[in-house]
Amino acid sequence: MKNTQTNGTHPIIDKKPNGTLNGDHQEYPTFSQEKLDDSIKRGIDLQVFRYPSTGINVLIAGAGLGGITCALECWRKGHNVRIIDRSPSPVWTGDNVQIQPSAILLLRHWPDMGYEIEENQYDVDMSYYRQTGERIWGPAPPMFNDPEHLPGRRGFPSVNAHSRIKLYRAFLKQAERVGIYVEWGCKVVEYWEDVEGHAGGVVLENGEKRTADIVVAADGLRTKSMTIVPGMPDQLTTSGKAIYRAGYPVEHALKDPTVREMWNFKPEDKPIWQFWLGNGSHNMMCLTHDLAFWSFIHSHAESASESWIPDIDPAEVITEMEKNDAVHPAIAALIRTAPKGSVVNWQLKFRDPHEQWTSPGGHVVQLGDAAHAFLPTSGNGATQAIEDGVTLATCLQLAGKAQAANATKVYNKLRFQRVSCGQKMGFVNQQLKQHTDWDAIMKNPALIRSRYPKWVWSHDPEAYAYEKFAEALTHVVSGGRVPLVNTNFPKGHKYRHWTMKEVQEQIKAGQKLEDLQDGDWS
């Protein structure tokens, strides 16, 4: 990848690739004793080490977190990478994003990016309240940071909460450090593959064609790859829910006397993260040293859109909240502090799990939301997209150019069951907060905590791909005659296909989703 700009790129930094060890050119920088000690103590690479070239050409369509992760890891694993995106420039909107430890592991190989993200993340404890103001539980860290889970953990810390804008900027900057520049304004209208020619490709809106050994569809829920992936549901299904969400400078919130009185928050204090639960809905609020975030998940309304255009009046949010339950005055006050142009109302749509993420020949492969939709209550969508990128790049490295098309199928087999179980956890958390069993919670308030299962956060996607690749490849090339036994989802669980409609009917019938699952989902 040449370190040059092309039409449509919008560089975040203006630097040449940093000193990397890539088999061709080696630089040996000096490091401070402090950095050397930290590298040894926490298991963080001193610099980015690039593996020898595989000769595999990878084209990634979609420069979200999953797509950028895939680009970075494909570069690190020795592949040739290009990345395009339909947006005319980077999208600097969004509020907060949750990243679990299994995805944070990636940063140990990208130290500059890791230190930047570590500096900007929000170390939050979580509390849970009723809309009356009654505290249920907390403050306490997310489950994966309970004291008993911390010994032996290495790499950068995972504290769960990040500014989406800061996190995304760090990923883009790291890509540019190694010479990967996103080509913006490239809208894909069609995917194709030529099995005999061992290639996949895309057609852009302007009629231009791009081709590569492997094409990664990382272009979101409405991916155009659905026409080339067998068995993929054509339509997205509404979940019946939508989410108001906002993020803006914290000084707007702290100007309000009711907000100041309720939370007594100062920018130098530890961030506050609270869930407020009502009748069939819930909202989240967070105050940090520089930003305020809040969200409210509610029953689907016609005003909800599929656009991130922040054009919602905060008064609309309060009106919608009052349909379910009385709104605490402090929550209403906080919502009113959102400045114009900061609030979105986003439909929560879902696509039932589909087992195949590749084109028939394997030259086109889906990643992130294009392969699997997550509800925000899972706190897991971005994490799984990052895991996807790590896994796919590793499978391509192990397969080599001759088996690259089979590598995408291996990636698919390693990921599907895990991701499908993760998707179901979004409904578990939704039921917990919107169909709360208050009798059980009053007996044991800790049961209200958001579920962050150990089988999710303790996973190492790179190590798992190295461990399972040969077994999975044999499974693929044998046409499934040789079994593959995945171990990256709940222990003891026997996977079976499920649908959103089935889960919603179970919730409506008053059945607890957690109690219906076999195996250990904790």
UniProtKB/Swiss-Prot annotation:
Effect of gene knockout: Leads to an alteration in the product spectrum, with an accumulation of fusarubinaldehyde.
Active site positions, chain numbering: R245
EC number: 1.-.-.-
GO MF entries: FAD binding; monooxygenase activity
Induction: Expression is repressed under acidic conditions, while the expression is induced under alkaline conditions. Expression is induced in presence of sodium nitrate, and repressed by glutamine.
Origin superkingdom: Eukaryota
Cofactor: FAD
Pathway: Polyketide biosynthesis
Listed InterPro entries: FAD-bd, FAD-dep_Monooxygenase_BioMet, FAD/NAD-bd_sf
Region annotation (Disordered) ranges: 1-27
Keyword vocabulary terms for this entry: FAD, Flavoprotein, Monooxygenase, Oxidoreductase
Residue numbers binding FAD: R164, D369, A382
Pfam families: FAD_binding_3 (PF01494)
EC category name: oxidoreductase
Keyword presence, Transcription: no
Gene3D superfamilies referenced in this protein's UniProt entry, alphabetically: FAD/NAD(P)-binding domain (3.50.50.60)
Function, in words: FAD-dependent monooxygenase; part of the gene cluster that mediates the biosynthesis of fusarubins, highly pigmented naphthoquinones responsible for the coloration of the fruiting bodies. The non-reducing polyketide synthase FSR1 is responsible for the condensation of seven acetyl-CoA units to yield a haptaketide. After rings A and B are formed by aldol-type cyclization, the PKS-derived product is released as 6-O-demethylfusarubinaldehyde.
Family in the record: Belongs to the paxM FAD-dependent monooxygenase family.
PANTHER family, per the entry: FAD-DEPENDENT MONOOXYGENASE MDPD (PTHR13789:SF315), MONOOXYGENASE (PTHR13789)
Stated name of the protein: FAD-dependent monooxygenase fsr3
Lineage: Eukaryota, Fungi, Dikarya, Ascomycota, Pezizomycotina
Gene name per UniProt: fsr3
